[in-house]
């Protein structure tokens, strides 16, 4: 789309908030159609690939293993935590993302920078290969490593185990990382964020999602105590909210036994906090918004459609 004057952005966000089950049925025929559509949706749930070995340990920790011989002698490890910024208290805004950073700043078996240094020596590039992300509802760590080196594979699983519940959260390392995260927040400021600040309240219908962006607030990032982030880690990094995904050129049986041996001792809190399911209410109508910013170099049109959650 051509940009008028090459300076002014016209960002069109059309939010089409309509799906089966959200409409108010006004006739018996509509109700029948809605029920039929819901039944069809249930039949369309994506089945689990039969090649995936899955299981759940007594502590609630879930695992998924799939053998994939290409690329040869490589394996991808993912630690998925069912926790993101949506569950942060007001004094924790930004700490789900900050906690993700701290996983690389010292664990029980890899203190300080040893984790990154070890993996780089094994040929794993920090950022390009070794990485993680935090969203509203999840935090996921990824680690691609060689699978033909038993020592590297063993340590890769140990790193996943350390991330799950053995990050050290050293006070000095926390304070060092504040500057990194604050700089990340600063770099995110600009035309895109200014426009986002305008349309997200409409997109999220002023729900909790509107004020729980993963980057957090500057006030919290500058001032939170070590105890505050440790409490967040203890509350939410727990086996009943975690899963390990292993895909690659590996022995599935051996990997399953390794996972059982390594992750069965993870502990859930004596009084686990409830993970509240937040949602975005539908308005049963189409919405339109146009926002502009002179620093945004292109024109963009977006059509967004809200669908029911897909159960896997």
Identify the role of each PLM range.
Residues 28-38, 206, 243-311:
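An aromatic/glycine/proline-enriched structural segment found at the starts
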Residues 1-12:
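Bacterial N-terminal signal peptides that target proteins for export
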Residues 10-21:
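Bacterial N-terminal signal peptides
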Residues 39-80:
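Mature N-terminal segment immediately following signal peptide/propeptide cleavage
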Residues 71, 81-194, 223-241, 251-254, ...:
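Active-site-adjacent, His/Asp/Glu-enriched structural segments that form or flank metal-binding
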Residues 35-53, 141-144, 201-242, 274-279, ...:
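Histidine-acidic residue clusters that define the catalytic metal-binding segment
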């Amino acid at each position: 789309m051509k940009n008028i004057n090459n300076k002014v952005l016209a960002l069109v966000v059309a939010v089409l908030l309509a799906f089966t089950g959200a409409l108010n049925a006004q006739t018996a025929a509509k109700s029948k159609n809605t029920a039929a559509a819901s039944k069809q949706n249930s039949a369309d749930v994506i089945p689990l690939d039969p090649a995936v070995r899955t299981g759940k340990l007594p502590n609630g920790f879930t695992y998924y293993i799939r053998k994939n011989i290409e690329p040869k002698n490589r394996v991808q490890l993912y630690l998925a935590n069912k926790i993101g910024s949506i569950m942060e208290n007001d004094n924790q805004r930004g700490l789900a993302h900050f906690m993700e950073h701290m996983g690389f700043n010292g664990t029980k078996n890899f203190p300080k920078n040893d984790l990154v240094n070890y993996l780089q020596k094994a040929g794993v590039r920090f950022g390009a290969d070794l990485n993680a992300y935090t969203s509203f509802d999840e935090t996921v760590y990824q680690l691609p490593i060689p699978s033909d080196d038993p020592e590297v594979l063993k340590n890769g699983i140990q790193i996943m185990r350390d991330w799950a519940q053995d990050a050290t959260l050293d006070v000095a390392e926390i304070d060092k990382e504040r500057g990194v995260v604050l700089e990340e927040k600063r770099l995110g400021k600009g035309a895109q964020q200014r426009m986002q600040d305008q349309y997200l309240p409409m997109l999220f219908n002023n729900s909790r999602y509107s004020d729980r962006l993963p980057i957090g607030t500057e006030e919290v990032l500058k001032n939170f105590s070590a105890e505050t982030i440790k409490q967040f880690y203890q509350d939410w990094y727990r086996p009943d909210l975690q899963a390990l995904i292993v895909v690659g050129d590996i022995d599935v049986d051996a990997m399953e036994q390794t996972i059982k041996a390594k992750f069965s001792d993870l502990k859930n809190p004596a009084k686990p906090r409830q993970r509240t399911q937040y949602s975005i209410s539908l308005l049963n109508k189409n919405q339109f918004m146009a926002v502009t910013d002179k620093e945004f170099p292109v024109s963009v049109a977006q059509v967004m459609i809200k669908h029911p959650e897909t159960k896997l």
